[in-house]
């Protein structure tokens, strides 16, 4: 039987494989969620560069958030990464939730990024 860590890695690889199959050259919005913070970055896999990034540890958000581990913080990160992506000239992305289910903080980040101008 697979350990929880192996199961997580398998699920992340499966999602990433599906994302790359439908990307068609579009950058991906990659999300990482820890117990205390949430991170998002727009990655261009063709060139291998990060185009925009934001997290709850970011200087622009650090003092404004009550905690980095709630849906409000995730929404703030989503809005900030969308602003930075639009400023960098990126509007169409593919959402890469990694091994996390589309619920709670991950969903809040995605919806805020859509409101901020990203389409996926």
Curated annotation (Swiss-Prot):
Function noted in UniProt: This is one of the proteins that bind and probably mediate the attachment of the 5S RNA into the large ribosomal subunit, where it forms part of the central protuberance.
Superkingdom of this protein's organism: Bacteria
A family per Pfam: Ribosomal_L18p
Disulfide pattern: none
Record key words, sorted: Ribonucleoprotein, Ribosomal protein, RNA-binding, rRNA-binding
GO biological process, one term: translation
Example of a GO cellular component annotation carried by this entry: cytosolic large ribosomal subunit
Quaternary structure note: Part of the 50S ribosomal subunit; part of the 5S rRNA/L5/L18/L25 subcomplex. Contacts the 5S and 23S rRNAs.
Species this chain originates from: Brucella suis biovar 1 (strain 1330)
Similarity field: Belongs to the universal ribosomal protein uL18 family.
Protein's name in the database: Large ribosomal subunit protein uL18
GO terms, molecular function: 5S rRNA binding; structural constituent of ribosome
PANTHER family assigned: 39S RIBOSOMAL PROTEIN L18, MITOCHONDRIAL, LARGE RIBOSOMAL SUBUNIT PROTEIN UL18M
């Amino acid at each position: 039987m697979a350990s929880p860590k192996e199961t997580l890695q398998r699920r992340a690889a499966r999602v990433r494989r599906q994302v790359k199959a439908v990307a068609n050259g579009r950058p991906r919005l990659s999300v990482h969620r820890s117990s205390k913070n949430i991170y998002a970055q727009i990655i261009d896999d063709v060139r291998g560069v990060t185009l925009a990034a934001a997290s709850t540890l970011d200087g622009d958000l650090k003092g404004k958030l009550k905690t980095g581990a709630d849906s409000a913080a995730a929404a703030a990160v989503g809005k900030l990464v969308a602003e930075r992506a639009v400023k960098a000239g990126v509007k169409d992305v593919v959402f890469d939730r990694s091994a996390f289910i589309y619920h709670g903080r991950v969903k809040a980040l995605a919806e805020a990024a859509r409101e901020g101008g990203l389409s996926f």
